[in-house]
Amino acid sequence: MTPPSTRRLSIGIAFVLVTLSACEKAFVPVCKPVSERTGEAGCWITSDATIGQLPSQPIFWHIDSYPSRAEAEPAKGPRGTVVESLGKVWLLTIEIAGWRPAGGDRVAEIGPLPVTPGLSYAAQYMEAIFTPGMTAPAHRHPGSEAWYTLTGETCLETPDGKMVGRAGGAHVIVPGGPPMHLTATGTEIRRALVLILHDSTKPPTTAAPDWTPKGLCRN
């Protein structure tokens, strides 16, 4: 028979482990740095950029491609970031509507993005490659998320319903705050550039264990 003191110690250890596990889960990143890449499929962080305060005009995500990094870097403005992703060199810029860099090929202008005047922002850029059926766990962002989909289809469920982003279709922009659950749908591999434009004082992504999706993206 186990002595009461031993049982109490075991229960206490178990409680601490569960508490630690819950705390760790709340800050588990959905995406990993590209330096930790172990395969093609997944979500990989290509850059974390400081943006600072934004103009009071409507703000957009500008996407331009260049033949090489050497050509993209001189065109980069104060809110621009050059990344190599999905086999191309991209200049990704947070700016007002109608902004254009020197050279390159204009790919997309996504927005307007929901922003808060006076807030200091950071931009996390990612490369997402999901096979059909792959999901990202429930999570939330302290700022807007947007995708530029090159191939495939993605369904995103939030408490307000679902939205679908497809290559060649309307761009997906999700305001910060609400929890979300992402599923790669359709029959093609999803390849996308992803932006999280977030409050620079907060982590870009946190888990959302307090919310359970209804499975709307399975229908």
Residue ranges and their predicted role:
Residues 2-11:
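Bacterial N-terminal signal peptides that target proteins for export
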Residues 23-120, 209-219:
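A short, N-terminal "cap"/entry segment at the start of jelly-roll beta-barrel domains
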Residues 64-71, 159-179:
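Short acidic-glycine-tyrosine-enriched beta hairpin
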Residues 120-125, 190:
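Extracytoplasmic
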Residues 129-131, 141-156:
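Short, conserved beta-strand element in jelly-roll/cupin
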Residues 135-141, 158, 183-184:
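Short histidine-centered beta-strand/loop micro-motifs
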